Amino acid sequence: MRNTAIYHLPGLFEFYELYRRFLPLFRTHREYFYDGCEIGSIYGAPENCLWGGGRFSCGECDPQAMMALLREYGISARLTFSNSLLREEHLADERCNTLCRLLAESGGPRNGVIVHSDLLAGYLKEHYPQLYLVSSTTKVLTEFEAFRQETAREDFAYVVPDFRLNKAFAQLETLARAEKDKVEFLCNECCWTGCRDRKRCYEVVSRQNLGEDCPDHRCAAPDAAQGYRFSKAMRSPAFIGVEDIKKTYLPMGFSNFKIEGRGLGSALVLEFLLYYLVKPEHQLEVREEIYLDNMLDLF
């Protein structure tokens, strides 16, 4: 049994202004927020990052400013360096190494890196042992035994399974306590559960981050043209909602939950924060503190 839900939030470089407003509320108005919820980390990568993967990044905030903000609030930073196609010559990339040094030397909570490539994982262990490693969901671990083996790897402090394992309760229950502590569920994925191209989609992002000239992946999922909609994600059989966390996952011994949203707009990411962290009766107050005033026009 776990009593605290620990959330790992998107937008380390994309949503500085949002978190600059949200985190003070989280500290000073705890009555707005659910009991037993904490922010474990904020993850992301700057735009045009060679080691980046998973999603195209568009974050432009000053890394020093974001790290100072997270130190102030005692929150871990995670670099999303989940490119699956890295080669030896890519490891010397100056920009990515500079970011790793920044996190390794920043003080405050221990920071980490989300990785796919075993080559990169080995390099980071050797050169930046201060950083913990997270096994990326871009590995698309849909077979439970492969996922179990990943949790057994000492390299990783956390492992994010494919979202289609979210409701494999009978198998998840068989994990040992130490394994459960490493599991980090992706809660709000909007991808079609029948998708067979998820790994290929991630590989396209990896190739393009390496500067390769390749076409964008064309999603064949039903309603793909709509893009991400939170309402659609909520209807997914793999969706993990607040009540699921309280009544199922915490009692089973799981406590880490990842919220996706790096490639989305800050308004939608705020809705994720409101849904997962803020009591319904206080959500309007949080909106008012962050952006909503009596002169705001939408149309």
Question: What is each residue range found by the language model?
Answer:
Residues 1-150, 155-299:
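Active-site pocket-lining/capping segments in soluble small-molecule metabolic enzymes
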